[in-house]
Structure formats: C-alpha cells, structure tokens
Amino acid sequence: MAKVKKPITRRAFVGNAAVSAGLLGITAAANVGTNMFRSLLDHYLGGRPSTVEHVEGSENWDTAYYDAQYRGRTQATAAANEIVDEILGEGAVLLKNNGALPLAAGTEVSLLGRYAADPIYGGAGSGTVDPNACVNMHDGIAAAGLNINETAFGWINDNYSNYPKAEITMDDPSTATYYIGEIPFSAYSGEAQASISGTTALVVIGRGGGEGGDLSRDLLGDLNSGVSKNFTANDETANYVEGQHELELTVEEKSVIAAAKANCDKTIVIVNASTPMELGPLMSGEYEADAILCVGSLGATGSTAVGKLLTGEYNPSGRTTDIWPADFTADPTFGNFGGKHYTDVSGFYEKNYNNVASEGTAYFVEYKEGVYMGYRYYETAAAEAEAGNYAGFDYDSAVVFPFGYGLSYTTFAQTLDSVEASGDTVTVTATVTNAGSVEGKDVVEVYYSAPYTKGGIEKPAVVLAGFAKTSALAAGASETIKIEFPVRQMASWSSEKGAYVLDGGDYVISLRTDSHTVVDQQTVSVTEKTFDTDEVTGTKLQNQFADLTEYMEKNCKGEMLSRSDFKGTFPKPAEDKDSADCGITIAEYNWKDHEDSAATMPTTGASNGLSLIDMRGKDYDDEAWDTLLDQLSVDEMTGMLNDCAYNTGAVESISKPETSEPDGPAGFTSLTGPTGNCAYCSEFIMAQTWNVELMERMGEMVGQEALASGYNG
C-alpha cells in the first residue's frame, strides 16, 4: 500500500518560510561579506585556481627570481626567530644601571607586574601577533639561567585576566579601552607577597598600541566623556587624576615598585612598550629603580634575548630613537595631537570610512611645532636657554633620556679624528676604543649645527647627520669609523624661495654619545648655495600645500613655534572650532569638477601580444610598459584597485597570475589568526639597534620567509 504524504499545514508552511527567509538572508549577507572580503579570504583559505603553461623550449630557463635558502615554512620561520632574538638583543636599551646588572646565573628573581605574565608581543591591527607562537617572558628569562620565584609568578599568571587592559578596536574608538591593567600589590595573596623577600625584583611595566587607535592623552576625561562604550569605571579608574595620560606610571604600578624596593635586594624595571614613557619617578626618590631596561614589543623570541641581556650573555648596545621627556604635557606637540573637530559639518556624510555613524563633525590637526619636534625641540630649547633667550626652560628637568642614549656593561672612549668638507661631501672619522673589561658594541653619532639668524629660516640647533655601529669590540680593542653625508643634507627649506637653502657660514660638526653629550667637535666653512631641483629626478622644486600654509598663518598666528621666541610662540592646546570661521570650505570630492575635456582616453583592450613575464628585467622607463598597459581593460584596472587586500587577482589580458601579498609591521602575521610565520619585534626596537646591516639581514630573512610560504610580495 502506497504511503500518502501528509499535507503541509499553514503553520508549518509559515514556519518553514520564515526559516527559509532567514537562511536566504544569512546566505545573502554571507555572499555580500564574502565578496567584500574575498581577497582576504583567498589569502588565508587559498585563492582561485590558476594554471601555468610552459612555453616549448623553456625547460632550461632560469625562472627563479631569488634562490630559496630554506626547505619550507617551518625551517624559514625557525631561522627568522633566531634573528628576532638578535634584533632585540641589539635593540633593547639599558636606560639606567646602578650596578644591578648583569645578574649572575642562578640569581633568584621575582617577576612582578601583570605584563610579566601577559607581555606585549606586537601591536593592534596588521601588527597583531599570536601569543601562542611566542616565547613568554617567564620561559625566556628562565632559559638564561635565572631562578624564577614561581609562587609570585603563579599568582599573577592565575589572576591577571581579572584586570582588564587596553584594547584597540582598529579605527573605532567607540569600542576601544584605555586601561593599564596593572594589579596593585595589595591584591597579591599573602603567600605571593611574602615570597619576594630577599629576591631580585624584575618589575615589568607594559603599554600596548597599534594601528587605528591613539593612546589616551586624558584618561579621566576619556572615561567621563563616554568616548567608548567599553571604557567604563572600575577599581583602576577610581585612581585616575585630572590630566593623567596613558604613558605615565599609575598608582598600581608604583605600588608594585614600592613593594619591590621594600622587600627585594634589587629592583629592576623592564619596560615592555614600544613608546617612550614618563619614567622620571624611577630615577630618584621613593620609586627609584636600580636598573631600567627598555625591551619594546617582544615578537616571537624577544623574551629569550631579555634573559640574555639580564645575565650579560648579551651586552646592551641599543640607543633611544626619541627623547624621553619628564612631562609629555610640556611638549609642544601635546596640545595639538589627537582628535579635535570642525563642528559644522552636519549632513556632510552619514558614515565614515569604517562604517561608523557620523556625529556631524570632522577631525583636524594643526601642525604648529614645525621642525621643532622630539630632540630637535629639546636640544634647540637648551641652546636658546643657555643663550638667555628661553627663560624657565631647564634641559635636565625636561628630559629624562636624550635621543641616541643607551648604556652598556662596558665603557667606551671615542675620539674625533678628522672632519673634512670636500666638494659635495662631509667626511667624519672617529675611533672607538673599548675601555672596559667585557666585549660590547658602541654607536658613533655625528651631528651638525647650522648657522641660525633670528627671524630667518627655522633651524634646529642640532641635527643627526649620520651614524654607524661598531663591530663587537673585545676589551681594549679599537675600531675606526668613517661617516659621510652630503653637504646638501645641511640645507633648510625656504618657503620664501621654494627651495632648499644652504646658508653660508660656519657649520659645527660634532661627535656625540647622544643628542646632548658632546665628545668633540670641529667647524667647517660652507659657501651659500640654493638647491631648487630634486637631487634624483631633477624635477623643479616648489612650495606644496600653499593653501594650508595660508590657513595656518591665518588661524594659528602667534602659535607657530619659532626659535626666535619659543616662550611667546609655544602652541596653545587645540580646541574644537567651526570650519566656516577658519575661512575654509569642506566639500565632498566630485570628480566631475576635475574632468579635463581636452584629455584623451588612454588606450585600453589593445591586442599587443605582451605578457607580464615579458617585462622581466625591463627598466622602469622602458616604453614596453606602456604597450603592456594598453592591453588592460577598464574592468581589469578597477578590479585590481577594488580587490587587492593581501593579494591581487589574475589579469587575463597580460597573463598575470593571481598573487599573494600579505602585509604587516610584525612580519607575515595576521589579525585573523595564526599564520605559521615569524613575528618580528616592533619597529621601535628595530630602530633602536642603530644597526643598518642587521636590518638588511632581517629584510633578506623576510624575503626568504615569503619564498618558503608561497608569498609573492
């Protein structure tokens, strides 16, 4: 007997229809999302299939652009991890040392602070690093032969997640948070507190950062303003004070340091941050540290280098790449950094580029400090104060660590052998001698001071001209370093002439151990000269952004920082304003307003018979490139522009295959998850190596990783 199908009821039909509609909606949304992020998905899940046809007779052609040195990703990543250890070993800066470092093997150390258990390995956005692919601080330090107090560390490791830390949501400050997340020492268990007695304290303080979000200049203000729905009151915020910013020590951090000083034999502070911080309290007084080591963001194996630095297997040779001020709020950049708004743009746009609803405002930044930023401000301010032109400025009170500063476990003696200005080049020769008892590297820093006329072209008093790092010098060994730089480098831009002007006169060339400490100096005489063409292309130079210059002269009058009167022209904090009051018009870009009726449409879709491979070895200016580009269709060009995140698709007309081009400042890492590639330490640490050759090796290593992983660029 045949089975009779039960008729569908209206209720079942409606229910099934609702489910089907929901599934269709989800499918449609998924299709839209997949299409929007197709290139990203292709990169991580595998792209569209492509085939390669070998031309007859090409069997013996050398088609490899570069020779792979490693067999696969695993081997390449292991080699890259070794370089990360080396980079951090040379890029970490020993900021202070009262004889506390290095530590002997077997020393019992107490790792303190939440960042001891939860270190900063990378940044936010494309700088995101997978912590599971990194050596943690505990294991890196233990591997160097130091005995870790597991009682204190175990408690911190079990409890740090109860204390939220800053989270940057890329390009969306409405969901970001600015917590430091440090655990007050009073919250430690009694057993953990007692366990640190008689040990050496390694207090790790950390700050994150990264793409799409600034650190807070006013923690209490940001909390009260509701700028982020996720940044809400808790025990930490109860201790915020008016004007406190994210780069100064918190009450909680000071409590840990104070406890370490009271209970431990030595207090060593490790700065796990890729930015200068206000560390004045650690230099003397209640919170004085015995040693301070800046290690930046660690990357995959930076923690092993930290252990080697602490024990002396690595001798610190890094140098700071910025001034470390005593008070950030007294810096000329502080008042005009961050998001100020034009408040009269309601209805101009509904959402910003990140699809966040507009609040009827538009951001602006007014660049009032001009050339006086970082060490160029502080060293110039010091020179003017010494000359009696900047009352109230005291360099020693304003600066904790100069630019180009760093200590070592040995001592070096530098001598300025010669300075010669011949033709278009200045040549400086210096000798470095290791006057200490252990092997180490030193950095040779050469600066110039140009003649300045009050009311003339704005010029810093001191500018870095060139640098070099020595090889590893054994105790008593010496090395002579030659540094060359073009005379043109000492010229300054003249907006009046629309060219670089090298004023005639005496230029002081100095050898320094940092931006402030002079070893020796000599003077060279230079004839006045104007450079009005680009030194590479020969293109005529001219002022750019004249409209913005006009804006600044009108709206920032008396606040454009000038060496002629630092005190009187010091920038005032920026405030929200109406664009109409500033004499500017904010309008959407309309391409039709810029259409050139006399322009000729470029050739597209031509059948010229060229393939992209035919361009191998061609000069950039070869006319064949134009012939190749004539083959592209408009759809192919727009497709490449609109679908090019982390890879680019195939282009049939020129036989371009689909290629993979990931990016990121920490190597081939990703905000979407693990990649199996190396995570490099932060650029902050790379720069602090002052070692060009080491950075070149790192660049070659990144290329080898790309070859091993099948990346094309």
For the regions a language model picked out, list residue spans one by one:
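C-terminal non-catalytic regions of proteins with extracellular/luminal or membrane-system context
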Residues: M1-N712
